[in-house]
């Protein structure tokens, strides 16, 4: 199979994930370089996130939508977000301690946010596969789903960069972005459930 440009961007996004995780986790095993490792990991994450928008845009614009892209693009997105959640939680959770939002509160908030995100993504993917296999119907991505993706990207960037670039904010930016991510993750999840439910119900 000859890969087109959107497909190559999707594969490139997957290839970037381990590099992003390695740079973020390196300070846990190394003795220094946390600031630069976090900056580099954030840049890699942002580049990977941009390819998510580019591959879909190019595929639609140039008529290069393929079955490979339909399958791998959302899978690559989930690998990226899941990898980011795991890496942040495993990175010694190096956030600035603060009287505003303590490390413990932020850790617990992000942990539960991560659980909700992973559960939501797996649930929606399962519903999509069941309905598609049963009736061949694909519910297109909603605006809520796109907003959800953006909140996840913003939250990950805040969690990585706020401790080193904006420590005087006392973790407030990261905490607020976690809450916003939780809200839109749940909201979009229920929206997809509502959209898929008639097909699931009729199939049963």
Indicate where each model-derived feature is located:
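Alpha-helical transmembrane bundles and membrane-interface segments of multipass inner-membrane proteins
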Residues: 1-204
